[in-house]
């Protein structure tokens, strides 16, 4: 089966590419920068240039493709912004999929997006869901909370480096999930008819707020975190200020999203039906404690080896003094 992965260089996209290749699928990746995506080619995927903001590039990329897996979203630094990539680009992609008679379209949205229409990214995700449902295409929509992998840069690395961890004064509890597990559910949906034209939450086994994660990282790393709390009022001011400048529109959109995640909400959902339909045991998914334990064990072991090598070099150089 031939699959086109969009957003393949991202955190989730690259894991889906690797997992799909491991399972024997033919994988093609739509990328804007062939050089930055070279690692995907080394894994065995085929690369084709394309850009969601340029609809004419989509039809050639879909030739010979049976399934679209769309993990793409605009980045905070992307000048095109959420409207160009996440709205116009998605509509163009859905139209192209209809024209090429794609057999299945898998889309990743955000859990509870329909509850936050005031946030541009949330509103656009909800609109895209509706466009897909009304398209006549066979679809599966997964609604996500967050990835384990994103917690490394946000918490683990600064704690190890004795740098500041920035959090807000209030914190949402989020049921993060490992992208390896998300990829497993994604690929399983390709062979289960029960997943056709359905929307599923994909969340971890428990919710974590910032304080919980920091405490876990401190325990596993043996380090004390340097924490700075940012008042939500500051985020609101920053967002309102950014809106005055065209170059700040995308920043303002992201700050609006951050503001939602900073309030005392719960981003979680029952997975009982999902596990049953996908025939996957909940105990087979990775928990955050295990994920971070493996990360810190690997990093601390490497740091110990480096320190040992440096100590040995110093002893050797002292012999010649």
Curated annotation (Swiss-Prot):
GO terms for cellular component: cyanelle; photosystem II. One of its GO terms (biological process) is photosynthesis. Keywords: Cyanelle, Oxidoreductase, Photosynthesis, Photosystem II, Plastid. GO terms for molecular function: oxidoreductase activity. Its EC number is 1.-.-.-. It is an enzyme of class 1 (oxidoreductase). Its main location: plastid. It is found in: Plastid, Cyanelle. Belongs to the NmrA-type oxidoreductase family. Ycf39 subfamily. Involved in assembly of photosystem II. This is Photosystem II assembly factor Ycf39.
């Amino acid at each position: 089966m031939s699959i086109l992965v969009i957003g393949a260089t991202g955190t989730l996209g690259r894991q889906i590419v690797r997992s799909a290749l491991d399972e024997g699928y033919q994988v093609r990746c739509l990328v804007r920068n062939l050089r930055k995506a070279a690692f995907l080619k080394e894994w065995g995927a085929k690369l084709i240039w394309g850009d969601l903001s340029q609809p004419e590039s989509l039809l050639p990329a879909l030739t010979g493709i049976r399934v679209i897996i769309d993990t793409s979203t605009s980045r905070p630094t992307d000048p095109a912004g959420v409207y160009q990539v996440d709205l116009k680009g998605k509509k163009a992609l859905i139209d192209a999929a209809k024209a090429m008679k794609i057999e299945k379209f898998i889309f990743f949205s955000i859990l509870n997006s329909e509850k936050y229409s005031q946030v541009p990214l949330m509103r656009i995700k909800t609109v895209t869901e509706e466009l897909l449902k009304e398209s006549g295409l066979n679809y599966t929509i997964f609604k996500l909370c967050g990835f384990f992998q994103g917690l490394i840069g946000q918490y683990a690395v600064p704690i190890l480096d004795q740098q500041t961890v920035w959090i807000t004064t209030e914190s949402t509890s989020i049921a993060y999930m490992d992208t390896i597990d998300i990829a497993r559910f994604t690929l399983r949906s390709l062979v289960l008819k029960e997943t056709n034209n359905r929307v599923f939450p994909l969340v971890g086994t428990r919710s974590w707020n910032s304080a919980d994660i920091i405490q876990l990282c401190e325990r596993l790393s043996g380090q004390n975190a340097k924490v700075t709390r940012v008042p939500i009022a500051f985020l609101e001011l920053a967002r309102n200020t950014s809106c005055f400048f065209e170059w700040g529109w995308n920043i303002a959109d992201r700050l609006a999203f951050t503001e939602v995640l900073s309030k005392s909400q719960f981003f979680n959902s029952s997975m009982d039906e999902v596990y049953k339909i996908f025939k996957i045991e909940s105990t087979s998914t990775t928990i955050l404690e295990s994920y971070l334990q493996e990360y810190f064990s690997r990093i601390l072991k490497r740091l110990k080896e480096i320190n040992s090598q440096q100590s040995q070099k110093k002893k050797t150089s002292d012999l010649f003094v």
